[in-house]
């Protein structure tokens, strides 16, 4: 692996643990990415799509009501306002442009909440690429509005009936397809995880989130935030937010994993703090595994956080103490979901609700503390309203 152009590791985490047949494919992808990053024409086309199709920059919104009676200022980075409804659209546009540059004629992707699938479908429709999306059968059921959106935009959605019928199984099927069709096909991985160079590519195609946030907060407040908070599943929205703040040592970075029904129940999706290091999905990173190394089922009310591993850069930031990683239960996330809707008129995705819940916890712990917090509101909650209605009111799913 010494002949890669970019460092494939973050400390001990990362790497390229894939079938031999895919090694040259990943190296070709890395080469194309490095060239594209240095090509002003590629960068201009990407920037144009982000601005005039996706709707960047997204707003930075001050919460006027949630912090009443406290000395906290809480801002939300509004990735929910991006075309497609979540941060996923950013890097999807970048990767499809890259795939076209490489002469690929077909896109495949995996999706959990369906947001990455929707982003892939809309970008493929606009950039005229055929698209197949693998999705766990369980997720197809709980995210039916997104399945309909994908099919409406011309994507072929394949429900995966294997294993736990969730995101990890969709990832495995997508990998299988790619191994068989890599000459014509680009695997558009949806998070900052997987084999090198994906964690680096996804970070670079998401880092405008943090770059914009930094500019906007300086403009609004004249200083950097004390704390930046983002939800962590695979970790793309969080690394996109954190990347531009990593060198700002006075800014605390907090990643929020899903505690599900409670860490002690085993039904959670918090491998970073409660898993062990192993090899999964083409990388070395913390994973939820039993003593025999078998991957355990992750669980979260939020389909997009229901993943048994985490991106290698998050593992590294945790190890060196640059970022803190905490967890929030389903119940806490549901409460935050309702609070934001009720008090600010914004319905957040259940993924983003985990980050918001931790921010509200921080505020509650110390209402007299003068602090400036930014939460990455990574997506909107339209896709989750039936799930939440069912839990709160026994409504139809």
Swiss-Prot record:
- Name the PROSITE patterns for this protein: TRP_SYNTHASE_BETA
Q: Which InterPro entries match?
A: Trp_synth_b_CS, Trp_synth_beta, Trp_synth_beta/beta-like, TrpB-like_PALP, TrpB-like_PALP_sf
Q: Give UniProt keywords alphabetically.
A: Amino-acid biosynthesis, Aromatic amino acid biosynthesis, Lyase, Pyridoxal phosphate, Tryptophan biosynthesis
* Residue positions where N6-(pyridoxal phosphate)lysine is found in the record: 88
Report the cofactors.
pyridoxal 5'-phosphate
What chemistry does it catalyse, as a reaction equation? (1S,2R)-1-C-(indol-3-yl)glycerol 3-phosphate + L-serine = D-glyceraldehyde 3-phosphate + L-tryptophan + H2O
Name any one GO molecular function.
tryptophan synthase activity
EC class name: lyase
Q: Please report a single Pfam family linked to this protein.
A: PALP
Per the record, its GO cellular-component terms are: cytoplasm
Q: Does the keyword Heme apply?
A: no
Briefly state the protein's biological role: The beta subunit is responsible for the synthesis of L-tryptophan from indole and L-serine.
Q: Which family does it belong to?
A: Belongs to the TrpB family.
Name the NCBIfam families on file: trpB
- Quaternary structure note: Tetramer of two alpha and two beta chains.
Q: What is the protein's name according to its record?
A: Tryptophan synthase beta chain
């Amino acid at each position: 692996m010494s002949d890669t152009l970019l460092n494939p590791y973050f400390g001990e985490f990362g790497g390229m643990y894939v079938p031999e047949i895919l090694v040259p494919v990943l190296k070709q992808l890395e080469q194309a990415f490095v060239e594209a990053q240095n090509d002003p024409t590629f960068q201009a086309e990407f920037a144009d799509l982000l601005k005039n199709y996706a709707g960047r920059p997204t707003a930075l919104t001050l919460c006027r009501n949630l912090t009443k009676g406290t000395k906290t200022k809480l801002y939300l980075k509004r990735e929910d306002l991006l075309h497609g409804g979540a941060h996923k659209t950013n890097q999807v546009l970048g990767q499809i442009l890259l795939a076209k540059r490489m002469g690929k004629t077909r896109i495949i992707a995996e999706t959990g909440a369906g947001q990455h699938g929707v982003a892939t479908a809309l970008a493929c429709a606009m950039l005229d690429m055929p698209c197949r999306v693998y999705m766990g059968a369980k997720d197809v059921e709980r995210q039916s509005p997104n399945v309909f959106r994908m099919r409406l935009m011309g994507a072929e959605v394949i429900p995966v009936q294997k294993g736990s019928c969730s995101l990890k199984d969709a990832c495995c099927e997508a990998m299988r397809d790619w191994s068989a069709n890599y000459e014509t096909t680009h695997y558009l991985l949806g998070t900052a995880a997987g084999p090198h160079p994906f964690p680096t590519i996804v970070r670079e195609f998401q880092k405008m989130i943090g770059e914009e946030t930094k500019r906007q907060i300086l403009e609004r407040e004249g200083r950097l935030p004390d704390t930046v908070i983002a939800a962590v599943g695979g970790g793309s929205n969080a690394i996109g937010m954190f990347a531009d703040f990593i060198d700002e040592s006075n800014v605390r970075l907090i990643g929020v994993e899903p505690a599900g029904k409670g860490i002690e129940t085993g039904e959670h999706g918090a491998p970073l703090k409660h898993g062990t290091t192993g090899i999964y999905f083409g990388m070395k990173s913390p994973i939820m595994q039993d003593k025999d190394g078998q991957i355990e089922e992750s669980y979260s009310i939020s389909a997009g956080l229901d993943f048994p591993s985490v991106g290698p850069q998050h593992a590294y930031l945790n190890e060196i103490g640059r970022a803190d990683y905490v967890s929030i239960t389903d119940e806490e996330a549901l409460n935050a979901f309702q609070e934001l809707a009720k008090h600010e008129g914004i319905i957040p995705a259940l993924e983003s609700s985990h980050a918001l819940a931790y921010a509200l916890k921080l505020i509650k712990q110390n209402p007299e503390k003068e602090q400036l917090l930014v939460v990455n509101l990574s997506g909107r909650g339209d896709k989750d309203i039936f799930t939440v209605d069912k839990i709160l009111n026994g409504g139809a799913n």
